[in-house]
Amino acid sequence: MIRNKKINFVRFLLFFCILASCGHPVKTNDYLLSFYDTTKNEYGYKDQNGAIIIPQGKYQFCFTDTFNTYAIVLKKNFGFVAINRQEKVLYKVFAFDNGPDYPSDGLFRMIENSKIGYADASTGKVLINPQFDCAFPFEEGEAKVSTHCKIQSNGEHSIWLSDNWYYIDKTGKRIKK
């Protein structure tokens, strides 16, 4: 009787281990690497074995050299965008200084419906929904933002003007200063 209980217990453990492993693929270094075709002056992405996954020329420029979960690319007639592994456009990336916004304090700015929000630089996930007319990069855990501002252009450069600036933390909550 004790022997049967032990055998049944071992069977249960074995069954549980097999069941627990189903549907949970083992995480590997599944990433893509950007490449540049010098003869055609075009960019694309290859896997670790050199197989072309995203053909060169599909995007004008690939800003993300190692494509894990998302990549920032320049899409013709669309601008700087974040795409996922299925090449779905996740959102537009805020344009800054002739390129996509740079990560600052782990976040970068993104745009949706002409409003600015913030995405996580590691995962590409939107952390603060787009709601600001003007938003500066995060520094030391806070960012200066406004929901009512105007853009004043000075030829090549422009500045944001607002009487309603305030600061937010990395969760999007207003900080009292």
Task: Label each residue range with its predicted role.
Residues 1-28:
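Bacterial Sec-dependent N-terminal signal peptides
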